Amino acid sequence: MSLILRFRSKDGMFRVNTDSSSTFQTVVDQLSLKLPTTDYDQITVSDKPNNKNDLGSQAKTLLSILHQTISELQLKNGDLLFLNYSNAIPQGTLASTSSTKLQSGSIAINSSGGSSGPATASGANASTIRVSPTTHGPVKVSQLPIDDELDSQDGILSRPISSMCRHGAKGMCEYCSPLPPWDENYRKEHAIKHISYHAYLKQQMAKFNKKELSSSYIAPLENPNYAINLNCNEGHQSYPRGICSKCQPLPITLQLQKFRMVDHLEYASHTILNDFINVWRSTGVQRFGYLYGRYEKFDKVPMGIKAVVEAIYEPPQHDELDGLTLLDWEDEPIVDAIAAKLGLQKVGIVFTDLTDSGNRDGTVLCKRHKDSYFLTNLEIIMAAKFQIKNPNITKYANLGEFSSKFVTCVISGGLQGEIEPRSYQVSSSAEGLVKADIITGSTQPSQIYVNGNNDTRYVPDIQYSKINEYGLEVKSNAKPTFPGEFLLVSLTDSFPIDPKPLFTSKISYVIENREFLGHGDIDGLDHLQNLSSVAKFIKLNDSELFDFHWLVHVAKMGILSEEELSLLCKYVKEKKYDDYLQLMESGGWMTFLTILEQST
């Protein structure tokens, strides 16, 4: 039977939902999210306030009753219990011992045996208390190096003495005092559209975890959850036969997201993008690729992050003039493994949407602009699914994940008919809407359709909020459709002035899955990856075997051992000739060269 227990402490009143057959451990797990301490050996529970009791029986610690059920403790719906503890108790997970020291002066909660004497923890051996990570600091996960680097910085923005200052060189006033990285005026003055992820994180940390409350911790990041709880235990039938305020999602108000997980997309060399676009130039069909690169610090935005693209891998696909279809990609684990050996990972996707203008001057049609759309509704949903598949790992969320650093880049026509890349992400709200199956595409590319209710989906009230021409906030109903721009976050993109790409072979290798380019052509073999193309690449480049597509092809051949493949990747990454000499002396490399000689 479901019931509610009430707890009163010096930090406030708490309500906990449970049932009579659950152990007190489930109650403590919920209390741990609200209490400023996790040392359960020092927290006493009583049915009288201030540890005062006429019967003279002893209070019990939370630790001593963890394994007893609610019915064994003779607790009823609505019972009020009092918690006593000290804020000076150190934080940390506590391992329980076989007995606990009890404080006197409070009446004990009745156990099944009715005894009010000293209690002991059940079990002869020590056990560890299950404590929510939010009670004692960030969770322990492996973040990206760039996140660890930015975590160690405060991001404070220094300002020089200005003409408004009326003090000496060692003074400070409101015109020259440092600013936090999320300062709104700084963002507007420097034309920064969104604050960075780590600036937003610092802002949330300052809001939820104040220094004077160092004994408590609240995870500052949380992904929105818009799905109904199909396993609600509030005593009603499961949805759709029953519903309550606890299991249904709250009303949703969509706003333009104020922060972005990645601020900038940089292609390490213009040839990376140029080679990708050449498919459209040759055939007129569209193309899709995965961006492999790394994340680095971006100095033009406070605490900013940029994704640096070193290679575009084109998976199996069926391309058409106005779209494409992705096919099964069986080699994805191999490609990811080679990228990891090189210090790279998937950072996003890229696809073309190009139509020749017909002017015979190399210009293309401009189809994406403020009066049409930037990403279509289906592309927004696709981007959200990719972001969900590639979450951002962070220690500042209870589940260790918050949104994503995965980028979506579309290559289309600019306002002057030029070919240009445009990079986007979708908001964390978009990810939540897609997870809950609330949105889908519509016949208008710029509009997103809101689904209706069904047996597994409950759609709450949804509104979107925008600022009108008078500077006032206006809310509109999002049903049945709403503009897709409310789910978009735009990035900047560029090429470096002084490019230093990782892959610098003199002659590029054949790019995968482009066999159709040579159809009906006497040079068709130039678009095939085979033993002949591998041997030709080695002959033309000598020792400069610095090409991602060639590395992946060699790995798929399965001739080199794991150690030899790692050595080859190390040589490509660090470009130390000693590693190349060591590779040449290995048995697998000699076998590899022998096979190439015999097959060509």
Curated annotation (Swiss-Prot):
Pfam families: NPL4, UN_NPL4, zf-NPL4. CDD domains: MPN_NPL4 (cd08061). One of its GO terms (biological process) is retrograde protein transport, ER to cytosol. Residues 109-128 have a biased composition (Low complexity). It is found in: Cytoplasm, Perinuclear region; Endoplasmic reticulum membrane; Nucleus membrane. GO terms for molecular function: K48-linked polyubiquitin modification-dependent protein binding; ubiquitin binding; ubiquitin protein ligase binding. Residues 265-402 form the MPN domain. Residues 109-140 are annotated as: Disordered. Keywords: Cytoplasm, Endoplasmic reticulum, Membrane, mRNA transport, Nucleus, Protein transport, Translocation, Transport. It is a peripheral membrane protein. Belongs to the NPL4 family. Involved in the import of nuclear-targeted proteins into the nucleus and the export of poly(A) RNA out of the nucleus. Has a role in the endoplasmic reticulum-associated degradation (ERAD) pathway. This is Nuclear protein localization protein 4. It comes from Lodderomyces elongisporus (strain ATCC 11503 / CBS 2605 / JCM 1781 / NBRC 1676 / NRRL YB-4239).
